[in-house]
Curated annotation (Swiss-Prot):
Gene responsible for this protein: rpmH
Name under which the protein is recorded: Large ribosomal subunit protein bL34
GO molecular function: structural constituent of ribosome
Database matches in InterPro entries: Ribosomal_bL34 (IPR000271), Ribosomal_bL34_CS (IPR020939)
Family in the record: Belongs to the bacterial ribosomal protein bL34 family.
Keyword Ribosomal protein: yes
Keywords, comma-separated and alphabetical: Ribonucleoprotein, Ribosomal protein
Gene3D superfamilies according to UniProt: 1.10.287.3980
Amino acid sequence: MKRTFQPSVVHRKRTHGFRARMATKSGRLVLKRRRAKGRQRLCP
């Protein structure tokens, strides 16, 4: 059985990156929540 986590920088950035978050309304809400909470890193 293969491991489920097969890391790829491209996939990570496109799915969870800052620009991906900014592209949708719900993504912007995610960033807003993380800013309000005081997260050091908003996106991976």
